[in-house]
UniProtKB/Swiss-Prot annotation:
The gene is SMYD5. It comes from the Eukaryota. This is Protein-lysine N-trimethyltransferase SMYD5. Residues 392-420 are annotated as: Disordered. It comes from Gallus gallus. Its EC number is 2.1.1.-, 2.1.1.372, 2.1.1.359.
Length: 420
């Protein structure tokens, strides 16, 4: 979601921990202020070819989803790199410990590099990630021997969040906790506060009379409970505004509208590596058939929840506005939190670079349905070429969508936050 004002290009490309986009980003794209209503946008500074990586970016802060971690989707506590081998990953998703994957040498997981925090035993994929976490936020958030103590303030906060926010998950209270911890540990606290302030944090779009779906009257009690637990666990005088009722709502809106989903999978990495193998035709057909059947079996056992999942705040990516016909997309091909923004078509210098905030299925729904999702989650009504072309369509969903929405609207809200 594009922020409201200011220039983040220098900050996003700077040397501060977690803020380094690839140097190529400086040449390929830059953030520009568009209007007070739309905020910033990302624009090409040169011609970009289809399939080209516009930039690669680390998040300012990121965190694995709490239910995802609880269900043993093992990921690095800092960069979210999947920690299971591809075979272990497939065995768990299938519920079949006897499964053996062919071509095990194509698995890129290096267990010999994994390290744990000596105090709380959270696991990292490398010494570099353990050190990066320690230097940025983990000194504040390390639970030490209290990791399994349900009365510890941080554990109470996480349990309350899990009881309000069931899968499919879209954010985590720990993303907010890591923001606070980052500022508390920082030598230059004002710099980090300013960096976080670059993200859009409005709780409502007054011009269009839209409020974020998780900040309505229905959820006032849950938000106040979270705020009190958040304050007990993390209060800091220099960040006192974040702990007030309105400040907490703004912080909540910030991670809700700017948080970029992150997905990693050692199995997916193994599949991509196998796809690149130069094999005789018969062996290629056998391997492809094995992989196809493997995914069918996993879908029956585990459904759609295949990846280690979390979310992060990305300075440059957050400047990308939405389009229902995007010219770029985000992905995580390195099996960690490094975000690649890749062109879906040729983009000319001066052209705005847009991604879609909707998934593929949502983009195929009616204009009314698409904008319902965008208003509730991102506080705007889309005016992309596709939406303008469908402007005269009835402001109702199709019969099929109407029936589905009637059955799922309340359930979706309950999935997001349930009464406690």
């Amino acid at each position: 979601m594009a922020a409201a004002a200011g220039d983040v290009r220098g900050a996003a490309l700077g040397a501060r921990p977690g803020l380094g986009a690839a140097a190529a980003a400086a040449a390929a794209a830059e953030a520009r202020f568009i209007s007070s209503a739309k905020g910033k946008g990302l624009f090409a500074t040169r011609s970009i070819r289809k399939g080209e990586a516009v930039f690669v970016e680390k998040p300012v802060v990121s965190s694995q989803f709490l239910w995802n971690a609880l269900y043993n989707y093992r990921a690095c506590d800092h960069c979210l790199r999947a920690l299971e081998t591809a075979e272990e990953n497939a065995q768990r998703l299938l519920g079949r410990s006897s499964l053996v994957l062919p071509h095990p040498e194509q698995c890129s997981i290096r267990k010999d590099l994994h390290q744990q925090c000596p105090r709380c035993q959270v696991t990292y994929c490398s010494a570099e990630c353990r050190q990066a976490a320690l230097e940025q936020y983990h000194q504040v958030l390390c639970l030490g021997p209290s990791r399994d103590d349900p009365t510890h303030p941080l554990n109470k906060l996480q349990e309350a969040w899990r009881n309000m926010h069931y899968p499919p998950e879209t954010s985590s209270i720990m993303l907010m906790a890591r923001m606070v911890a980052t500022v508390k540990q920082a030598k230059d606290k004002d710099w980090w506060i300013k960096a976080f302030s670059q993200f859009c944090s409005k709780t409502a779009n007054e011009e269009e009379e839209i409020a974020h779906k998780l900040l309505g009257d229905k959820f006032k009690g849950q938000l106040e409970l979270l705020r009190l637990l958040f304050t007990e666990a993390l209060y800091d005088e220099q960040l006192s505004r974040w702990f007030t009722p309105e400040g907490f709502r703004s912080l909540f809106a910030l991670v809700g509208t700017n948080g970029q989903g992150i997905g990693t999978s050692s199995l997916s990495q193994w599949v991509h590596a196998c796809d690149a193998l130069d094999l005789p035709m018969l062996q290629r057909e056998e391997l492809d058939a094995f992989i196809d059947q493997l995914y069918k079996d996993i879908e029956k056992e585990s459904g759609e929840f295949l990846n280690c999942e979390g979310s992060g705040l990305y300075m440059l990516q957050s400047c990308c506005n939405h389009s229902c016909i995007p010219n770029a997309e985000t992905s995580f091909p390195d099996n960690n939190f490094l975000l690649y923004l890749t062109a879906l078509e040729d983009i000319e210098a001066g052209e705005e670079i847009c991604i879609s905030y909707l998934d593929c299925c949502q983009r195929e729904r009616s204009r009314h349905s698409r904008n319902k999702i965008l208003r509730e989650n991102y506080l705007f009504t889309c005016s992309c070429p596709k939406c303008l072309a469908q402007a005269d369509d009835p402001d109702v969903t199709s019969d099929e969508e109407e029936e589905a929405e009637g059955e799922t609207d309340d359930a979706e809200l309950e999935d997001e936050m349930t009464d406690v």
